C-alpha cells in the first residue's frame, strides 16, 4: 500500500485516465478527494465500488473549472476537513475537435481557460496548504497530442 496515510486530490476522475488514477490511488490506500464537474449515478456507483473493493475513503467534490469562485469554494471544502494534502493530480481537461481555421477564438479561450488557467488557479490554492504543511507533490497529466499532431485537435 504505497499511498497508505496519504491524501490526494484528483481532478477529472470520472472517466479515462483520471478514473484509472482514482482506482490506482484507491488500490494503494490513499484517501482521495475525487473532483468532478458533475456527480451522476455512474460516478456514485464507481465510488461505492472502489471503497468496497479497497476500503479507502473517497470524498466526492463537485465544481466547475470555468468558475473561479467555485474553484476556491471547492478548495475551502477540501481544506475544511483538515487532511493535509500530499498529492495533487491535475487531470481535468476539455477537448474540441475541429480544424484550426474553423475554431473560434471564443472556443480557443474556453479550452485554455479549462485546460490551463483553471488548473493553475486550483494549484495555487492547494499549494498554499502544501507549503504550510511543508510537503506535497503536484502532477499535471498531459497527452501525446502535442507530440503527434492529431488532425482537428490543434486547440487542445
Describe these PLM feature segments.
Residues 7, 14-15:
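Conserved glycine-rich cofactor-binding loop
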Residues 28-45:
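Conserved glycine-rich Rossmann-like NAD(P)H-binding loop of the short-chain dehydrogenase/reductase
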Residues 91-96:
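Conserved NAD(P)H cofactor-binding loop of Rossmann-fold oxidoreductase domains
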Residues 99-100, 107-112:
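Substrate-binding pocket helix/loop in short-chain dehydrogenase/reductase
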Residues 103, 149-156:
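Active-site loop-to-helix junction immediately N-terminal to the catalytic Tyr of the SDR YXXXK motif
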Residues 123-124:
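A short, exposed helix-loop element centered on a Lys and neighboring polar residues
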Residues 143:
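Residue(s) in the substrate-gating loop at a strand-loop-helix junction
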Amino acid at each position: 500500500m504505497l499511498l497508505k496515510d496519504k491524501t490526494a486530490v484528483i481532478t477529472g476522475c470520472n472517466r479515462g485516465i483520471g478514473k484509472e488514477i482514482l482506482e490506482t490511488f484507491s488500490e494503494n490506500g490513499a484517501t482521495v478527494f475525487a473532483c468532478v464537474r458533475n456527480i451522476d449515478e455512474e460516478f456514485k456507483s464507481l465510488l461505492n465500488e472502489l471503497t468496497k473493493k479497497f476500503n479507502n475513503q473517497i470524498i466526492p467534490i463537485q465544481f466547475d473549472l470555468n468558475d473561479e469562485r467555485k474553484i476556491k469554494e471547492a478548495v475551502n471544502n477540501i481544506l475544511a476537513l483538515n487532511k493535509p494534502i500530499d498529492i495533487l493530480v491535475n487531470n481535468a481537461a476539455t477537448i474540441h475537435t475541429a480544424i484550426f481555421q474553423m475554431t473560434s477564438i471564443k472556443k480557443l479561450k474556453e479550452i485554455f481557460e479549462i485546460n490551463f488557467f483553471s488548473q493553475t488557479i486550483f494549484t495555487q490554492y492547494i499549494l498554499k496548504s502544501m507549503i504550510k504543511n511543508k510537503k506535497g507533490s503536484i502532477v499535471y497529466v498531459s497527452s501525446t497530442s502535442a507530440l503527434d499532431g492529431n488532425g482537428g485537435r490543434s486547440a487542445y
